[in-house]
């Protein structure tokens, strides 16, 4: 069974959001999560899940 790593990427997520010119509410709507969850992610109070990382990549066409 593979061990999962916990990944915190708050500052990078915040920088990406700002570079895209998005508010937390807009990004949350795009990713189908709550704005408060975006805020928690950006403050490193929640880890970035693999599912959410994939949604970010698909939604914003990232490699």
Language-model features, listed with the residues they occupy:
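Short, conserved catalytic or interaction motifs in soluble domains
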Residues: 43
């Amino acid at each position: 069974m593979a061990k999962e790593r916990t990944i915190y990427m708050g500052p990078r997520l915040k920088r990406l959001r700002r570079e895209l010119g998005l508010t937390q509410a807009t990004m949350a709507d795009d990713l189908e999560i709550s704005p408060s969850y975006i805020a928690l992610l950006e403050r490193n109070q929640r880890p970035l899940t693999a599912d959410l990382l994939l949604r970010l990549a698909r939604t914003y066409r990232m490699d």
